[in-house]
UniProtKB/Swiss-Prot annotation:
Subcellular location as annotated: Cell inner membrane
Gene Ontology MF terms in the entry: NAD binding; NADH:ubiquinone reductase (non-electrogenic) activity; quinone binding
E.C. number: 7.1.1.-
Organism: Leptospira interrogans serogroup Icterohaemorrhagiae serovar Lai (strain 56601)
Name this polypeptide is given: NADH-quinone oxidoreductase subunit D
Keyword terms: Cell inner membrane, Cell membrane, Membrane, NAD, Quinone, Translocase, Transport, Ubiquinone
Length: 405
């Protein structure tokens, strides 16, 4: 089991290596791992004979904290899972709680949540595909997209007050309403992203070295991908047409028009192609929404659940009482078992919650998508070259904060 993978475990298992074989540590502190991940790899020359993955270096007991924190407080933990696209985590948790409480939010809230979700998805895919190019020596390609990533971060920072740990959304609505130039700036970002994505796509797909390092590398069949629990772009790259936004719609995803890109062999190349097309589809979704954001309130009228606005708390006794009760006594969720899944940037992010009607959950379990990808890493790289393992790891988009949770 994972917790048994100590130095003694590896010393015992690999003490009688065949002549010419070496044991190599890829991580836990290595640029190619993009986080605190450890892969112990047995190689013969440059060929990988065996590999084992070790997790837990940044385990922070989030599920246990979920049993101590109130439903509002746990939102800060979701920030620190997949920290590349935190609003997607925030929205997933809030939707789970709203499902438990059968809360309906105004349409304005849903529109803004969807726009921010797709902007966050684009950021995540820029990081994943851009860093893959860097790992393979194609540094300049990433720079074509990072300028636009920064523009998206500026929008998110203006809206939420933070770039990474956004703590975006509240039970029943948003933390605050969108700012006056929000629509204009989102449209400008989308306009600039379109040619940048095509240029980046051209830089990689017309590069023989990139194609040689990714085509047919780290592939997985559709059957094995399903068996390992793959979801998201990695599953679709293997040829499986499954996207929570289409197959189990939430928010207003059933009311917008977009396509689901599907790969064939689940290789590094096809994972990259799927993510590039998903960026185009995210822009398509945003453009259908941004001009139609309805007017109206940016939160439901729920004194028992929605934290009141600060200026009202400071000037109105009734609002101060509501604020005190929500902070001190928490939001009371009906007893029962609930599961809510959303399509995060790297796959199906699910929250399983057991409530006993108290201010804190009795049990919280997070279905983090990259946990399942990492279990398959040894199978993907076995028999391949050591250099190819770096590309494979990068294309899986394993985020250490989410993996260990």
């Amino acid at each position: 089991m994972m917790y048994e993978k100590t130095a003694e475990h590896f010393e015992q298992k690999y003490k009688n290596l065949p002549e010419g074989h070496l044991l190599v540590n890829l991580g836990p502190s290595h640029p190619a791992t993009h986080g605190i991940l450890q892969n112990v790899i047995q190689i013969d020359g440059e060929r990988i004979v065996e590999a084992e993955s070790v997790i837990g270096y940044v385990h922070r007991c989030f599920e246990k904290l979920g049993e101590r924190y109130t439903y509002n407080q746990f939102l800060v933990c979701t920030d620190r899972m997949n920290y590349v696209s935190t609003p997607l985590n925030n929205i997933g948790w809030i939707l789970a709680v709203e499902k438990m409480m059968q809360i309906e939010v105004p349409d304005r809230v849903t529109y803004v949540r969807m726009i921010i979700s797709e902007l966050s998805r684009i950021i995540d895919h820029i990081i994943c595909t851009g860093i893959l190019g860097v790992d393979l020596g194609a540094f300049s390609g990433m720079l074509h997209l990072f300028h636009h990533r920064e523009n998206i971060y500026q929008i998110i920072e203006k809206l939420t007050g933070a770039r990474l740990t956004t703590t975006f959304c509240r039970i029943g609505g948003l933390e605050k309403d969108i700012y006056p130039d929000f629509v204009k700036e989102v449209k400008l970002v989308c306009k600039g992203l379109k040619p940048a994505i095509e240029e980046f796509n051209s830089l990689l797909l017309k590069n023989k070295i990139f194609l040689g390092r990714t085509e047919g590398i780290g592939g997985i069949s559709a059957e094995n991908a399903i068996a390992y629990g793959y979801t998201g772009p990695n599953l679709r790259a293997a040829g499986v047409d499954w996207d929570v936004r289409k197959d189990e719609p939430y928010l207003f995803y059933d009311k917008v028009d977009f396509d689901i890109p599907i790969g064939e062999d689940g290789s590094v190349l096809h994972r990259s192609l799927v993510r590039m097309e998903e960026m185009r589809q995210s822009i398509r979704i945003i453009e259908q929404l941004v001009d139609g954001i309805p007017s109206g309130p940016w939160h439901a009228d729920l004194p028992h659940a929605y934290l009141p606005e600060k200026h009202k708390v400071y000037n109105n006794m009734e609002e101060l009482i509501y604020h005190f009760k929500i902070i001190m006594h928490g939001v009371k969720v009906p007893p029962g078992e609930y599961y809510m899944a959303t399509e995060a940037a790297n796959g199906e992010l699910g929250f399983y919650i057991v409530s006993e009607g108290e201010k804190s959950p009795w049990r919280v379990h997070v279905r983090r998508p990259c946990f399942w990808y990492y279990q398959s890493f040894a199978e993907l790289v076995r028999g391949g070259l050591l250099a190819d393992s770096v590309a494979t790891m990068s294309s899986l988009n394993v985020i250490a904060g989410e993996l260990d949770c």
